[in-house]
Amino acid sequence: MRCRGALSVFAVVLFVAVAAPEVSARPLTERGAASAPRNTALIAAVNTVRTAHLLPLLQVNANLSRAARSHSRDMLVHAYFAHGNFALRMSRFAVRGRVFAENLAWGRGVMSANATVAHWLASPPHRTVLLDPSLRRIGVATPIGAFGGFARATLVTADFAG
């Protein structure tokens, strides 16, 4: 969600999991070659939407990428789905800017970039983030691991700064 000043954050749960037997929360893929194509596809899908709305393309930022990767991994390992202390995370990863935002998503199996962006566009708070012209940088993480009672789930963190 979008944050200014004190960086107040609220969570919007995008996907709801159906109860299932508990499984290990250890991520199957945290980073590297396995998640790089998913990350690239997600950024491309977000930028396609921004282009269609005559907005500037988001540029990948290493600090935002590290923050997103850290948060997705933490949610997988500790089995929670929330923005957490977003302001502290931006500070910890030396993310600079006037405006910050974050979209989260998770789903069973491997989530496609287009499906993720379609869900965000259907949610007014997430749509606002995607179409915010003041946001200029992005970092994403799309690890796959046990989550929400499923042996295989994708947990998406997209962090933005302007």
Residue ranges of predicted features:
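Disulfide-stabilized extracellular recognition modules
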Residues: 24-26, 110-162
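A short alpha-helix/helix-coil micro-patch that ends at or immediately precedes a cysteine
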Residues: 26-77
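Surface-exposed patches in mature extracellular/periplasmic domains of secreted proteins
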Residues: 52-66, 79-90, 127-141
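Short, surface-exposed glycine/acidic/tryptophan-bearing loops
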Residues: 66-111
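Positively charged n-region of N-terminal signal peptides that target proteins for export
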Residues: 1-4
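Bacterial N-terminal signal peptides
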Residues: 8-18
